[in-house]
A protein has these predicted regions:
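Alpha-helical membrane insertion/targeting regions
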Residues: 1-205
Length: 205
């Protein structure tokens, strides 16, 4: 029962936050994270391309990535698994590169920037490794790297959980954002490590 509830919560959060970028097209640009950006940055064509590429394709990756972990879906339709995988890979590669670029302009300065840039690099590299493993038919290694990849992707969810909590604790958005730049993904990777270790012990991967 606990496992089922955890899975439902996991999928629900992935879907909700995966659809979240659509809000940026429905409300004024002063909303949310954009309210902390300087006008000259918001008027930059290159930055806007990077920002919207990152949030749209990152949202897509989050929205469809969980499907790959469903053994039932994979068993029933391996073709769907492969097609979703290709779409996920494409979305991640473009979103992570865009994320690395906009990371240089992150609110909170160099510490915040390094956090998000590191996340972008790790997301790109783990996904690339997952792709190379499956190309070489190394299924277990592929599965492990995909867990790490989606753990990095899930940072979009954990960021939105931690940020309001940190703002309430510190009473300052900038301070909270510097912390969340690391807190949104480092614990995720630690959890991914525990999951892959446990699955390896059970012989699943």
């Amino acid at each position: 029962m606990i496992k089922k509830i955890s899975w439902i919560l996991f999928v629900t959060l992935a879907i909700i936050i995966g659809l979240y970028p659509g809000i940026y097209f429905l409300i004024p640009r002063e909303f949310g994270l954009l309210s902390s950006k300087k006008p000259e940055l918001l008027n930059s064509i290159l930055w806007n391309i990077g920002f919207y590429t990152h949030i749209i394709l990152g949202g897509l990756a989050l929205l469809i990535g969980w499907i790959q972990f469903s053994s039932k879906i994979r068993a029933r339709n391996i073709r769907l698994h492969k097609q979703v995988g290709k779409l996920y890979l494409t979305a991640v590669f473009l979103s992570s590169i865009a994320g690395i670029y906009i990371g240089f302009y992150a609110t909170g300065g160099i510490v915040s920037s390094m956090g998000f840039i590191s996340l972008g690099i790790i997301w790109f590299c783990t996904t690339l490794m997952a792709y190379l493993h499956i190309r070489n038919k190394q299924i277990k290694q592929h599965q492990k790297m995909m867990i790490y990849s989606y753990a990095a992707c899930f940072a979009a969810v954990t960021l939105r959980i931690w940020l309001p909590i940190l703002i309430m604790i510190f009473g300052d958005f900038n301070k909270a954002y510097v912390i969340v730049a690391w807190l949104c993904w480092v614990p995720n990777l630690l959890v991914a490590k525990l999951i892959t270790r446990r699955l390896s012990e059970l012989g699943f991967i």
